[in-house]
Structures are given as structure tokens and as C-alpha cells.
């Protein structure tokens, strides 16, 4: 079995996070023109989890969940919200970095890992910082309409890769991989793109012919069979509405910028993977690549994240390294909550009893091994999605439901929740809906303001 293959010598871990990366990568087939050779090569030599989902479809809470191994129903962060160290439920919960450090690992981290970085009582979780540099932005808006949020801008900028924070991080990580360590290492590398603003150098835009870029299918009647509450949940004030994007005439240009940013970050991943391959650590390093949540580019007439639909919850998830045989993708439901327990088992560390995910080692050994629980995603308080191998059930706080059959409707165009013949499926999936939920935790600074609409 896999865990024994690496039991003699503790393997290193290269833990790569990418912000806002959806399935528009070659190895997931979400966009037919996506150019991602480095990640595709990684997928070929490891295990590609094609049905992996975040626990919360927004940066802060998703990352707190990954790093703690504890879900939102326990820690109480359901949106942008509080820092890891502010959550009372996580007061004694070690980050994955801390757990590895406490068990003999040297920890390095750079870029965006936790949304608010390793600060306060988390400062000591990381032995060596790889830095967290920002990329330059133009002084004036390049592409965004005047009535859009400032972050929603895009274009071919700056001139060279060397100016980009993600490239600087990749090169710092690559340099660190040349070193010899006197103990196994856990290296966390967090890339920012394709998070907005979608500025990357011109050469990444030149990979695509804007006029020929395929746009997502978007039937005008797509939202007609949805419960009314979905509108309030999915109204994400920071992002433009689909109507605004279409009216502005910018959909194709914005889609182009996202694809260019994905190809750029693939190059950054390649710099790190090439450095690992050339290093003395090549044969003894487990690689994990993941994104904190998905991203809509007009699908279901929505932009950005926070929804409980496939585009928001589904994430790339790859494992490769010693003992992980290349093979078929795994279609069983996986959750980002499963990363922490999987790595603990692969590296033969003592278990952290508070972890709420389930190890993916059985699926690393055999991609067809069944999993006995679906992936649960929650957005805001009281709204949940249950994603099994073939189905997605969404249940809103007011009791309204959506049901999609992914065997025939991967775009989630047809809501089956009201069909009499599907009530048994709903009942079966509804058993997984969280029964108890920690109240939403708001730090004192936010309580007076209430939720941003």
C-alpha cells in the first residue's frame, strides 16, 4: 500500500495553492483552448481528482478550512470573514504547517497561503518565509468600465514576467529547492493569478486569438427554474453582474484575460516543478496542487465565486510523487478538507484527532475505490451543497432546493428538485446536509457594520 511505500524515509511535501483557478485547465477539460502544459504533465504522472470541491467558495474561509482541516460548521467562518487566529474554535487547532513542524519537518511558505498570512500566534508555524510580493498595477484603469469595482480590471501589463510577484515567488521557491535540508521539508507556495485584477505580460495574451475564444454556454432561460432565494445568495457586490459584462461588450476580452492568467500561472508552477525535478529532492517529494475554489465566467449568468454551483465549488486537485502511480483520474467526490489527513497519512505522522476530512490514500492507490461520503460546500450561513459522484443537491436557508444529474447535465441547466421521480435522490443526499452549524463568527471590528450586501 502507498503509505508503506514511503514509510522508511519521511517524504518532503510541495504544497501548491492557486487562487481562483477553476476547471479551465487542460487536465480538467473545462475550456477547450486552455494552454496549461506544466499542470497537465503533473496530472499525467499522478492522480487527478476530477470531482474535488472546496468547503466554502471564497478565499478566506476556504483557506482556513484547508489549513486547519476543520470545516465551517465547526469554525463558523462562512465568507470573507475572520482570520484563522481570530476564530475561537481554532484556538488550539494546529495548521497543517504547524503539525508538520511539530513532527520534525522544516516549514517554508510564500505567496498567498492563508488569506491573512501566518501572523500573530501563527508566526512560528513557518520556519522560512519565501516572501509575498505584489505584482504592479497600472496607475489608471486599463479595461474596466467606470462603474465596476476597482479590482475588476485586466490587460497586458506589465511588460515582463520578471516584474510579476508570482514569478518572483516561483524563482524564490526554485532557489530554495536547490538547498539541502537536514530534515524533511513542507514547502507551501501560493500563487495569486488568476485572481483579479487579471494583469499578466503581453506574451500570455498572445497565446490566444481573442476573436476565436470559446465562450461558455449560457441559455437565456437558465435561471427560470431556480428558487428565488438563489438571487440574493449569489449577488456578489464586488463582481460585475452578467448583464453588466454583456452590456459593456467586454465578455470576450475578460475571458481572454482569465485564460492568459491561467497560462501565466501554469508557467509559474512549471518553474517550481522544473526546479524540483533538477534537485536532490525529486524522488522523495509529494506534490499537491489545489485551488481554493472555482470561478464563474458567465456560466449560470454569474461572475466570480460564492455560489453553490459546479463552477464555484469545483477545484483542480492533483497529487504526485513517491508511491503515487500514474493512472486514471478519480471521479469520486473529494473535499479540500481531505488534504490535511491525506498528507498526514502519506508522511506517516501522528494523526491530528480534530481533522474532519477523510484520507484520499485509498483513491491514490486505486482511483475507482468508492468513497462513502459526498463533498459538502457551504456559502453564507445555512446554505449548503452536497456533491456526490453523479448528483448535486443545493439546499438554501429557506428550504428551497436545486438538484442536478451530472451524468446528463454537467452544466447544471436543468433543476430537477421539483420532479416527483427524483424525491428519493433528494432524500438520500439530504441526509448529508449539516445538522449543526456553528453560528457565524464575526470579529468585533465587523459586527457593527453587518454583512456587506
Residue locations for each model-derived region?
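Formylglycine-dependent sulfatase
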Residues: 1-396, 400-401, 410-453
